[in-house]
């Protein structure tokens, strides 16, 4: 509780306004978790109000730092907490919009916390909850750095997190010590799996590879009248039981997410700034119109880690609903197979099985009755309603082939890309670190090196091989685009 005695009217008003802004920001931030994860109109206005209040709060504490330090007792970890909340806002806005520019904004505020050591005295407060805030900050910062391919910084942060967890455990002997050690192991396993092949400079330092879309990595596209579709909505589902993951993101999901994004544009004004001091968080606005239609840098994505059947259907329906004219929906499934016991299949949409969905939130409801279908399974027939609009399905599963018979009842474009059902015995252990099929989609050369047991190679060899891959992609793209459209009327 702040003591108002000993303050003049001006100081009292400043402290009261700060307390009001701080409390209002907490209320709005806590309300974010109640917003639906799907749709657009349902949450954009609320996010806008939350950004507005945090902008005012950040500006206010900058302008009145001296009074807040002496009269309110503002501590550095409290400033760090505000910066951390702003970083979280930008990260979650990225998740909801798929625009990578917001990742840079999140990175800027997270980097400021580390650069200015806002949490450096958290341990001296002798409060375990502050240490937990610090550990959570590290975990969130690592996720953002992973998505921005700042691997050198990721390794530094992992080492720092390791030290912080050890200090936390020795000081407080907390009940959640095992959970934090598990988080640390997940991060280390994820970083190890993510680098399927090591590319080295002449001095043996690793090269940071990027596999997002960019001018140098995307084949040039010749626009023609039949090319009227654009990818607008994406649903990425990860439900492989034995696969490395971190923060609700499996390795397969992480790779596919980057494969379907354009390379982030570095902002030179604060990419290397140690602090966001002197600048304000900006409120994300509507996408700039292009020819009267909203334009987005990237297709909108939903990321679902081990979702239930109901969740898959809800998010699919939301993406389907949001599709504009001439828009296409992409569904990516990385999941274990759900196999059928039907000896004489009649209904191809359900009798051959599908891929598993989670039952963790619904263990009792919908148990399989004798002779009935598995309720916690996504069947090919479940996708039939969504073929009313252009649909692209990518299935990475040991039961992928069952999706090859999806009919085109509504005459809309449909493509189904399926993984092999089996992996050579010598490569079966690889799936724990990510599916080979998804790795080929993400980085064909890295996948080729993996199956050839090439763990590392010099950067000049990598670049030479990559040139061959790019030449193939350019030629393949040219042939596909110039081919007759009706050859894609069947699922591939």
Residue ranges and their predicted role:
Residues 105-235, 239, 274, 407, ...:
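Cytosolic small-GTPase signaling regions in large eukaryotic proteins
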